[in-house]
């Protein structure tokens, strides 16, 4: 994935996987939805997708073996159906599982919610996993990029935003940073985004609350965009991707690029 072209990344929110409380007993249902959503993103003109076990709430800090195995199978099958890059995000913060899946299915990037520092979340206290991820990357070298949140949503943070960002890059090894609002679907603080763009030595990606209106506002301050909630039917996170909505926002991005 080319982070120099301001990529538009669509989120495939997976239905509850085996091992999670909400699993319905059908991997085929999960796979069919994932392939359908991914195909719509590609048809709409998105540059990449990211698979996320969003339906597995309440989340554990690390995932079970059955969840990891099913996630990997689904990611592999989705990859066979589309040609755009794929990313992996294992909630709540299982960066080792994310990288392991990405490595095995030849994905292009992963997202890590808490790479460095500490976050106080609805799952309890989550500590950064930079060391574990760095060791795994050393054992399994690849071109997989690490996109890491700074002051991730659904969490309280006590370090300053500036310190957290610089630590995420300089000590955590992030290839890009992600800035979000306070919750899924919440718009980012433009002042925070502007600060991130000013001080970050790596690309800055907007990771929540995007729509065709505000993506124009954020364009000059961001190097990429992750879209999930707005492109769903009715703007509801757990619904299927709306091809019409996905196409609308993709057309805005292409217009801003001058394509």
From Swiss-Prot:
InterPro entries in the record: BtpA, RibuloseP-bd_barrel
Signal peptide from the UniProt entry: none
Family annotation (Pfam families): BtpA
Domain of life: Archaea
Family: Belongs to the BtpA family.
Protein name, entry field: Uncharacterized protein PYRAB10620
